Amino acid sequence: MIYDFLKEKKFGYTTGSCVVAGAYCGIYYLKHSVKLNIVELENSKNDKLIIPIEDVKLGKIATIKNINNTGKIKPNRATTIVKKFSGEDIDITNGIDIVVDVELLKMEKDKPKIEIVGGNGVGIVTKDGLQIKKGEYAINPKPREMIKNNIINLLDDDERAIIKITIPKGEELAKKTLNPKLGIIGGISILGTTGIVRPMSNEAYKESLAPQIDVALANNYKKLIFTPGNIGTKYAKIKYGVDDDNIVEVSNFWSFMLDKAVEKGVKDILIFGHSGKIIKLAGGIYDTHSKVADARNEILTAYSSPFINDKQILKNILYSNTTEEIVKILEKENILHEVFNLIAERVVERVSSRWEGIKFSCVIIDMKGDILGSHIYS
């Protein structure tokens, strides 16, 4: 399939594709003295990606490659800028500049044919368990492979290339991603499996969550704490004194992340978090985004019914505006913990029947971190 990003508005291209295009353009300029305004790339599925180039110029500190047959000095360094385009996908990297410096050198023994390094704005891995080794730049394997496959034919047999990636806004943007939690510091990651960003698929985001499990296992944690997000993380650390690496934030994607847990051999999970998200699991809802399914009031009404005979109170629960409002009703009836203990028990029953081989426990908290209910595996 051909993706022409001069015309394409729905799909976008990844940070990895930006680097490939920038590297190709820079080397082509050095070899042929021609400034390309588009680059045609190929991904691992043999799709064609046509990516626009923002700018290309000789490197600021162009060293001397050689004196060619015409007697002219030939520079060996170029800088290319490619603007990231995310199509219709919601992506914080949309529109940022990816700067790629290329340097051509004579092939040397024990030197790689193509060397790929990071610069300012590209994160550095500081924890074990990820696809990239600790201490290296967070440039994932697939983009590395795509870079090499697309530029190898531009190089002479006696020639090697150094590709350096800089992202001017990378360090600032990284604070809005999972990178700090994963131990990737100083910038964003260079990502992309196919090089194409697909709109609103959530696939890229879900895949970015999964490495948290790898980090936890690499640190030899046996019991992992799965939580929807910041509230759960905050209070898990306070209540249990655990490190960030022991906590896995699943966002809304419980089914995906529990599948990954089984795949990676996790044996013990504590489901911990705010009632508004966790109670959905008791209803068999494993994508907890409100646009997918809600049913919080219906679930709370159902699990309150064994303890309440008054139909009007049950109706008040059903038509409450927030979970917090329902909590107040249950407190007034002196059945708060009974209801949430029952919900926690049902959460454990449901996930245990679907994801066999994992010991589950569940703790449900309110916005202040107080425990509403729990069911601990024994």
From Swiss-Prot:
The reactions it catalyses are: Co-precorrin-5B + S-adenosyl-L-methionine = Co-precorrin-6A + S-adenosyl-L-homocysteine
Q: Does the keyword Kinase apply?
A: no
The protein's Enzyme Commission number: 2.1.1.195
Please provide an example of a Pfam family that matches this protein in its UniProt record: CbiD
Keyword S-adenosyl-L-methionine in annotation:
yes
GO biological processes: anaerobic cobalamin biosynthetic process; methylation
This protein's pathway:
Cofactor biosynthesis; adenosylcobalamin biosynthesis; cob(II)yrinate a,c-diamide from sirohydrochlorin (anaerobic route): step 6/10
Query: Which UniProt keywords are present, listed alphabetically?
Result: Cobalamin biosynthesis, Methyltransferase, S-adenosyl-L-methionine, Transferase
Q: What is this protein called?
A: Cobalt-precorrin-5B C(1)-methyltransferase
